[in-house]
Amino acid sequence: MMKMRWLSAAVMLTLYTSSSWAFSIDDVAKQAQSLAGKGYEAPKSNLPSVFRDMKYADYQQIQFNHDKAYWNNLKTPFKLEFYHQGMYFDTPVKINEVTATAVKRIKYSPDYFTFGDVQHDKDTVKDLGFAGFKVLYPINSKDKNDEIVSMLGASYFRVIGAGQVYGLSARGLAIDTALPSGEEFPRFKEFWIERPKPTDKRLTIYALLDSPRATGAYKFVVMPGRDTVVDVQSKIYLRDKVGKLGGAPLTSMFLFGPNQPSPANNYRPELHDSNGLSIHAGNGEWIWRPLNNPKHLAVSSFSMENPQGFGLLQRGRDFSRFEDLDDRYDLRPSAWVTPKGEWGKGSVELVEIPTNDETNDNIVAYWTPDQLPEPGKEMNFKYTITFSRDEDKLHAPDNAWVQQTRRSTGDVKQSNLIRQPDGTIAFVVDFTGAEMKKLPEDTPVTAQTSIGDNGEIVESTVRYNPVTKGWRLVMRVKVKDAKKTTEMRAALVNADQTLSETWSYQLPANE
């Protein structure tokens, strides 16, 4: 068997003809481990100013010529298209094709693109390189290729299934997220994509990650369908110590919703890519954490051992909840991470960042292990990410789940039937579920509730909801210091039987 010999990052990989040769994540890991033992070299931009200084509208004019999609002349159902550099996408990435016998560089050519009104000198871009790539597949119709994967910028990637539109993103790795020292954003600097056979229903992508304090080798197996599933294997190597490492990170956006209504009049009742963090803890507990757009940076940690799963979900898909014909938030997927093997002790961490508009991703969720590897030592993360609009799959089948969280001014009904505000905040939480719908409406359902030191539960009531055939919890809370966050939890029970997941909410400071 011929041994692969890496010449350098700048030299094209040697072609192989041995039938026994096969490319694997170990080949990428050798490069990652070698890089980790060297000083970091920041990527260099070769982008002419006409592209670097362009506005978004100009960048949008640069379109890939669909007739020149990579693998267009092959019978494989997968096709590749590439992103041109421009704006802040100003650093080239290397993209290689892996066949049964060879690895070869996919070279940039301006002929792949149409440039619209963008004036440029062809000689200055002939060796420019790509900013990233996208994968096309006939996911919605047999006679039409639709984009299902986008790899563009840092270590971000977006994935969709049938009938979905792009929303939240996944990332390769998060470093020092929300720490005062500032976040470090690793980037995928090189990709290797296996040429699929005509009958293949999955696509394999390898990636080399690099940053000032970490390197990594990744293998992504994309399995498109009604739910598109990505199987991820990563091998991480630290160059230097980090404050916090985030594995399987997800990035999303939450601007406003019924738990935190828009401060300005808006025809859209809700505006978000995701509205909650769902966690299946190692001890079996299911937790639902509605998202906020806080006035100050907020970080929540859920400590556990060997998590069974977590994800940023878009619960509630009625168009009337969003009313947005352009951006179709009702069609944006949830993303669910299922760990493989035991991840040990650590925390699922949620970061919520203030934002004034929907163009900024302000939500991050990831797994952060208690024990970090020493520089040069390998750390593995293996997991799948499911991109789905079927949230019924993403909670315990025998437990009720939180359908909606609403926040309102707390009040008390007077003898004259007029409601009088009493200085409290009311939370209206609707629980529903297949098993709960089977319960008689006179079932004595009650709530187990708790609140942190900064609040007091003034009243808690549970009543049957005939519309959803579930139960509604109304909890009135008095906050002691509005400048501090207030934590609260609730779950529905019937005697000693737990009926629902745990609703875990943080009321932001200065609300």
Swiss-Prot record:
Biological pathway: Glycan metabolism; osmoregulated periplasmic glucan (OPG) biosynthesis
Coiled-coil segments on the chain, per record: none
GO MF annotation list: carbohydrate binding; catalytic activity
Subcellular localization(s) per the UniProt record: Periplasm
Signal sequence extent: 1-22
GO CC annotation: outer membrane-bounded periplasmic space
Alphabetic keyword roster: Periplasm, Signal
Gene Ontology BP annotations: beta-glucan biosynthetic process
Keyword Signal part of the UniProt annotation: yes
UniProt keyword annotation of Signal present: yes
Highest taxon of the lineage: Bacteria
Family the UniProt entry places it in: Belongs to the OpgD/OpgG family.
Function: Involved in the biosynthesis of osmoregulated periplasmic glucans (OPGs).
HAMAP family noted in UniProt: MdoG_OpgG
Protein name: Glucans biosynthesis protein G
Organism: Shigella boydii serotype 4 (strain Sb227)
Gene: mdoG
